[in-house]
Amino acid sequence: MRLRHSSGILGLALTMLLVPAMPSFTHAQVIKSGPPSCPGVALTFDLCPVRTGVGYDQALIDYLIEQKIPATFFMSGNWMTRHDEQVRALLQIPFFEVGTHGEVHAHLPLHSADEQKQEILGPVRLLKTKYGHDATLFRPPYGEFNDDTVNVARALGLQFILWNVESGDPDPTLTAIRIEDRLKQLVRKGSVIVMHANGKGRHTHEVVQDLHQHLLPERNLTPMTMSDLLTCAQAAP
């Protein structure tokens, strides 16, 4: 998974000639981390469709619930339609937060602004109409976006959430130890860690256990939901 901001030079030049330019995204609109003074870390999990398997890491979710670990889940519309029971269960946990992750996990920069709007709006509408939940967080599939993506999300009132620590948990060549070593190098105050709760991460459950039992307490870091991380104030001295 890579963070990708796309802007074709030729396309941009034509746009500037033909229509008034939309404002380019700012770093304040694309959120990759919380305040660097915050002694907290956001554990975020993408829930997108999978080709094989049940698409839900029940053991991971059970551990988060048993240990009362705050977490944020970004759900795609397709995933939600196939996992109604799991969506309802996650929404009931008071220390869990739910955001959206596009309708079909599309490569958004390949689509027009109108097409992107429909892709982003799909799961937002589903969460509201079927589950009575108002979505406020959005993460683009694959971390790919362009200015249209940011502008559409902003117009819909969604906070645009990326990450600054990539666990790499879907990579079948990575062992749990290698993922843990990567996190030890990257995790710090205000970090946003991206992982998966759809079963794509073979070692995600084990890695989260290590985070909770060792890495975070050893660094005096507390797991938080994404929203709590963004409003986190520096701990009193």
Q: What are the functions of these language-model segments?
A:
Residues 11-21:
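Bacterial N-terminal signal peptides
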Residues 25, 29-37, 65-67, 202-237:
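C-terminal domain-boundary segment and adjacent tail
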Residues 62-74, 97, 113-146, 151, ...:
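CE4/NodB-like, metal-dependent polysaccharide N-deacetylase domain
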Residues 48, 76-78, 103, 141-143, ...:
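Active-site beta-loop-alpha junctions enriched in small/polar residues
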